[in-house]
Amino acid sequence: FSSGAAFDITRNTVLYNVGFITLNLIISIAFAIIMSELRNKKLVKVYQTMSLLPYFLSWVVISYFVYAFLAPGNKGIFNQMIMHNGGMPVNWYQEPKYWVFIILFIGVWKGIGYNSIIYFATVMGINPTYYEAAMVDGATKWQQIKNITIPQVVPLMTILTILAVGNIFRADFGLFYNVPRQSGALTPVTQVLDTYIY
C-alpha cells in the first residue's frame, strides 16, 4: 500500500463490489418475482435455464463474446450498428469512460441467474394462504408483492448481502483481467486489488 495507486485500486475494488451487490440484489429479486408470477411452468424453466447459463461460462469465453460486440473499427457488432446509423466507430478498448458500465453490466449479467434462482426458491416457498387472504381482502398484485413477498424474502436478502459484503475487497480476477483484454488505457477504471497483485 505504499504505492500511489493503492487508493485508486482499493476504491475501484470497493465501488465495483458495492455496484455488483446492489444491482444483483435488486435485479435478482425482481426477476425472481416476475418468474413466480408466470403460470406456464415450462416457460419458467426456460427463463431459469437461460438466466443461469452465463454463470457456467468462463471469463475467457465471455471475454470473446464481449470482444465480438466491442471490437475496434468496423469489426465489432456495436460499431457496425453505430456506422449503419451514420456515426463514427468507437475504439471501446481505448475509452475508459464506458468501462465502468460495461464491467457492471457483464458482472451482473453473469451472476443474476444464480441469485434469482435462490430468491425464486424462497418466493415459491412462501405460504400460499398469505396470498389467498390478501386477495380476499382486495389487495392488488403490487400490494401482495410489497406486503407479503418482499418481507418474506428480507431474511435471505440480509444473509446474502452480509456474505457479499464479506467479500467486498475481493474482485473477480477473470472479469477484470480477461474482459478488458489487458488494455493499458483502461487501467484507471479496471485495475482492482486482484489484478494489481497479479
Predicted regions span which residues?
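A structural signal for multi-pass alpha-helical bundles of membrane permease subunits
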Residues: 1-198
